[in-house]
Structure formats: structure tokens, C-alpha cells
Amino acid sequence: MIKKYWLIKSEPEVFSIQDLNKSTNKTTFWDGVRNYQARNFIRDEMKKGDGVLFYHSNTEPNSIVGVCEVVKEGYPDHTQFDSKSIHYFPSSSPENPVWFMVDIKLQRIFNTPVTLDNIKKNSILKKMRLIQRGNRLSVMPVEKEEWDEIIKMGS
């Protein structure tokens, strides 16, 4: 099986890479995704062992701040069933879940965060989905060449 690469976005005041670093075994479930295209990536394509870039959004500066790995493949997001959760989805049921999540484990925090501005300035990354107009997905695929360049920039 060919390893795939992904980028996930999180607002650091909601859940930061530092929060992940403090989590048990540096692992967490990636819940609350409520976009069908992102859900399909999680449910159908993200596989154990895939690489994940952790992106801090809605902050200054927006940056890729570290590397994670998928450690559990897509399974139903439990928050969709919890009426007290902000992610509650009343038309979903345990028998017919709509939303899915994966578990990720922190591999490392970058010494140098890779800022959105630096991504935009790098010719190797000019086609990266993250910087394409109108792309606001919280989960998106990353090409191997882009992955390698980001890893180099963050080291």
C-alpha cells in the first residue's frame, strides 16, 4: 500500500500542537469535521501510517507546526451523537453515522514553523491545495513532493 500524506487544520486556541504533545501517548482523535469532502477523506482514504502535517489556522502567522501519523483509520465521530456537543448532528445515529474521525499521533514539532507566507513564496509548493483559492477544507491531501519540501522547511 502506498503511503499518503495529509494536512489537517486546527485553531490553536481550540486544539494546538502543544495540546497534542500533552495528550496521552501524544495521541488524539480528530473529531468535529463537518464538511462532506473532508469527511470522505477521513472515512475512505486516510490509512494507518499515513503522514499528517499539523496546521495552525486563524492565528498569526498561520503555519504548519509539526508532523503526525494516522494511528487509527476512520471510525464514527462520537460527538455527532452527543446532544451537549457543539458537533451534535441530530439526524445521525450509531446505526447510520454521518461523520467520521481518525486518531493521530504526534511525531515531532517543527523547530521552525512553516508559515503560510513562506509556503506561498516556494515554487515547489505553488500547486499545494492549502494555497489554492477557495480551498478552506480542514483536511486535505498533500503530494509527496510537497510533503518533502515542507519537512525540509520545518527542520
PLM regions and their residue ranges:
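Compositionally biased, charged N-terminal/linker segments
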Residues: 1-48, 146-147, 154-155
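Short, charged beta-turn/beta-strand-edge "cap" motif at the junction between a beta-strand
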Residues: 55-62
